Every structure is written in C-alpha cells, then in structure tokens.
Design a protein with these regions (language model features):
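Short beta-strand/loop segments at the ligand-binding rim of alpha/beta enzyme cores
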Residues: 7-9, 83-91, 108, 184, ...
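Conserved anion-binding
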Residues: 15-22, 57-58, 104, 115-197
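Glycine-rich anion/phosphate-binding loops
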Residues: 21-41, 67-71, 115, 119, ...
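Catalytic domains of carbohydrate-active enzymes, especially glycoside hydrolases
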Residues: 37-53
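Conserved beta-strand positions in the central sheet of alpha/beta enzyme cores
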Residues: 48-51, 89, 110-111, 133-134, ...
Length: 206
C-alpha cells in the first residue's frame, strides 16, 4: 500500500466469543461463515484492510492458550482469503500465531503489546518482510474499573509526560523491530487509545 497518500479503513473481525465491542463471532456452529459474510460486507463498504483477532483485549477478559487462538483465527483467515481480495492483518502478540497466520494468508501483524510480550515476534516479522503495527500499551489485564456509563475499562497508568512517555516507549518498540531487521518503512505506530489510559488521556491523544 502507498502509505501517506490517504487514510486507510480497517474492518475488524473478532473471532472471539467475548469481544470488547460486543461483536465477537466465535459463537454458534456457523461462526466462520458469519466472519466471511462480515468480511464481504466490509469489502462492499469500502474497507482497505481486514484485521482478524482471536483473543479479546476487553477489560477483564480471560487469557487463552496459543492453541485456542490458532483454532479461532486460522479457519477464518483461510476462508476470508478465499472469498475477499483484501489484505489481512493478524491481531496477535504471539510469535507462533503470527507465523501460522502469515503462512495461512495474512499480510501483516498487529501487535497490541508492541513486540514486548513475545521475544520472537520481531524476528518473525523481519523474516516475513511484512508490515507490523506496534501499539503502545501499559494496561494491566486485572487492573480494571467498572463505570455505569462506560462499562469496564482499563485503569489509567501514571505518566510523567503522557505524550513524551508514549513516544519514548514506542521508540523502544521500534528499536526492537529495527534490531531484528524489520524495514523501517514497514512499521506502523498505534498510540493505544483506550489501553492503560484515562478518558482524559485518551482525549488528549486524539
């Protein structure tokens, strides 16, 4: 894709039963077909990229194993790849899941932990020569608050300088990618709105 020429639209396909946005598809016997229909609708609506994830990042969600994640995402990637001609992003922080997803037809990796959770992830991305979305994330899975209007949310972390700290920590993730041999032109940065930040901090980022 020619980066920088325009804004690209990503359609999110949650192959989970417990999505943050309430649209998890991994329920019922025909959930793979449901995911394909959603992908087709995204394509018809003008999406440029499809992002497929198998582990919920919603506040209070329970972690799953790599085997469970693979069982959710691989059938969807395979089926979507056969029916929709759009690049597929695999939303995972696990190197072995990313590797299998890329082999199944994904085009890039979206890591919500910015290469910090799995030491092999940067190497997998470098070997594949694919784009990598590096997200800033200080959230702690069990550090969750419930609010009447907002529902569950991650509790904001302490920042000495919100923008400066995020830039510094993203640079650390960039350095991990570059050290592994990832091409700088393939790195996409995500400031992590909603992850380990208060509502006010999220507004400041936006």
């Amino acid at each position: 894709m020619p980066w920088g020429q325009r804004t690209y639209i990503m359609g999110i396909i949650n192959a989970t039963p417990d999505s943050f946005s309430g649209d998890g598809l991994a329920v019922g016997a025909d959930w793979v077909e449901t995911a394909v229909r959603q992908a087709q609708q995204f394509a018809a609506d003008g999406a440029d990229i499809l992002d497929i994830g198998g582990e919920s990042t919603r506040p209070g969600s329970q972690p799953i194993t790599a085997e469970e994640e693979l069982a959710r995402v691989l059938p969807v990637i395979t089926a979507v790849r056969q029916s929709v001609n759009l690049p597929i992003s695999i939303d995972t922080y696990r190197a072995n899941v990313a590797e299998a997803a890329l082999q199944a037809g994904a085009s890039w990796v979206n890591d919500v932990w910015g290469l910090r959770m799995d030491g092999r992830m940067a190497d997998v991305v470098a070997k594949a020569g694919c784009p990598i979305v590096i997200m800033h994330n200080r959230s702690k899975p069990k550090n969750v608050a419930q609010e009447e209007k907002l529902g569950g949310r991650y509790v904001g972390m302490e920042y000495g300088d919100l923008i400066g700290d995020i830039k510094r920590e993203l640079q650390e993730s960039i350095d991990l990618a570059l050290a592994a041999g990832v091409d700088a032109s393939q790195i996409i940065l995500d400031p992590g709105v909603g992850f380990g930040k208060t509502v006010e901090q999220n507004r400041q980022l936006i």
